[in-house]
Amino acid sequence: MKDKIQNQNFMHTLNAEQKKAALHTEGPLLLLAGAGTGKTKVLTSRIANIIHQNLALPHNILAVTFTNKAAKEMSERVHNLINCYGLNIGTFHSMAAKILRDQIENLNLGFNNRFTIISHDDQLTLVKDIVKLKKDIDAKKYTPKLIHIIISRWKDQGLLPNKLSTSDTNLPLQKIAKLVYEEYQKNLLISNVLDFGDLLLYNNELFIKNPAVLKYYQEKYRYILIDEYQDTNIAQYLWARMLASLYRNICCVGDDDQSIYGWRGAEVGNILRFEKDFAGATIIKLEQNYRSTLPILAAASNVINNNKNRHSKTLWTDSSSGEKIKIISCLSDKEEARYIACEIDKLVKEERYNAGNIAILVRAGFQTRSFEEAFINSAIPYKIIGGLRFYERMEIRDVLAYIRISLNQNDNLALERIINVPKRAIGAASLNKIRSYALERNISNFAAIKEILEIGNIKAKSYESLKDLLTKIDNWYEQFIIDTPINVVKAILDDSGYLAMLKEEKTEEAFGRIENINEMLRAIAEFNDIHDFIEYSSLVMENEVLETNYGGSVTIMTLHAAKGLEFDVVFLPGWEEGVFPSQRSLDEDGEKGLEEERRIAYVGITRAKKDLYITHAESRKIFYEIVRSCPSRFINEIPDEITIRTSSMKQYNSFYKF
């Protein structure tokens, strides 16, 4: 029996190319979807059509996104079209985590399915600890942060330590990183924890070593859809290719012109070689834009057409009207900020736009300070997107560590984080004794403490504290089996003394931390399984960019963070050589770097729906130095006939207030 279609006319709302993609059901499909062309609508319509035509049951369909927000939106939109249950919609990491939760023991490496996922900060802490132990590593020259970046890159490329080639370890830093990588993986194994790179890395190892396991998931996921394919790294690409190799019913949606995450492992070549990977693939282009005006689309197309390594496509719209793009020359970066502040003030006071629909998108973080000053002086409400995220705050990470050690007693990082929080009279000497004992016997710190307590080889005060803590951890584990996550976490907060510690501080900071913990409890209350919450919180930290409404404040954010968003009015400041395109990108990656910078410009331009301002300064203060500058080459790539080019000085008399 066919699942019930909620909206019988959903195909009639698609344009010709969208409908062609939604009706395509057999064989590989590459959907080249330009900015604002309705790709999510097509993806969800395609899923609904596959189910409605009885080509697959919902649980045989796998849809992969890059963020939890995108996964949730896709799921909701599918359910608005067709009444079905059991769809597999999630991020790369969440889907990989589910597979490993069921299959990790088939890797025969020593992991079990009670593994936990450690955060970025915990990964860095572990690297630091390893570097400290290796006395021959100069930590000032070869910093743990750099070593961690290299290890993460290798994982994104699908490379375990034993698969690194000579070319991967040519440089002294790479040689050291390999040594640390080997020790790092051993530590993860002892603690029964994985980092984010491991999720795809071990999935791929699992599929290669266990053809029967791969076949099981190929049969399970007969239809595969991948969103934002241009942002995939090598490990994600290999994972998708293996899963799709049996039935070849894979639909990859992306826009190579919006591939802007090369610095974090994204490989634009994945989308460019799709036709080679899947012979006979169908290619459909979505070029009709439903977001921006004609001048904005013309600007975007003219800029991106200067890139050589791309699939040819041209955005167009039914609308023939639209404001010309304003390109403003300013004397300095301070004047640039004042001009933008005054222009925003005028737009809002004239009731042309709401402040919440206006954004300033910068290429680099150092550009934001001048806007903060200008907005404060002009009493313009604003918010800077960035900084510390919720799940990265100290108190949240502490509570997460308590939960993790309760679920997985071998989690060394979690135990070390909470062992003395609140204070338990466990000094440095006791901690070192525990670490050394564990290291010598190749066991976890938790197991080491148990053995030390049995021997009695520790100070009396520490003995009582450690015995009490271990007993509580055992109790919390048992409680998680029989009680709801929210009840157990509340018990942890009370029994551990953590909440009492904050209450005793009686400071504004402590009060804020308690409020954050209460907010965390509200999130936990939505989960029936604590493992689901732990995975969710970890993946949110890695994947989410912005999950908030725009309110009545102007948004200031980087161009990278703005991808996927849209605003009525967009200001693009700092379009000068050296700032944008970034000199660092040009120096390090040459033509490849320039093409990525141009894609970033394309993303910035296409965030605007109605009005676009591009500004550049004749001089700019960069790290305390005044630097003379030239307009960005990208400005010269925008045709004169769709622009109004002027100087901010011409407008001083009309609206600047002193």
UniProtKB/Swiss-Prot annotation:
GO terms for biological process: DNA replication; recombinational repair. GO terms for molecular function: 3'-5' DNA helicase activity; ATP binding; ATP hydrolysis activity; DNA binding. InterPro entries: ATP-dep_DNA_helicase_PcrA, DExx_box_DNA_helicase_dom_sf, DNA_helicase_UvrD-like_C, DNA_helicase_UvrD/REP, P-loop_NTPase, UvrD-like_ATP-bd. Residues 294-564 form the UvrD-like helicase C-terminal domain. Keywords: ATP-binding, DNA damage, DNA repair, DNA replication, DNA-binding, Helicase, Hydrolase, Isomerase, Nucleotide-binding. PROSITE patterns: UVRD_HELICASE_ATP_BIND (PS51198), UVRD_HELICASE_CTER (PS51217). It catalyses: Couples ATP hydrolysis with the unwinding of duplex DNA by translocating in the 3'-5' direction; ATP + H2O = ADP + phosphate + H(+). Has both ATPase and helicase activities. Unwinds DNA duplexes with 3' to 5' polarity with respect to the bound strand and initiates unwinding most effectively when a single-stranded region is present. Involved in the post-incision events of nucleotide excision repair and methyl-directed mismatch repair. This is Probable DNA helicase II homolog. It comes from Rickettsia prowazekii (strain Madrid E).
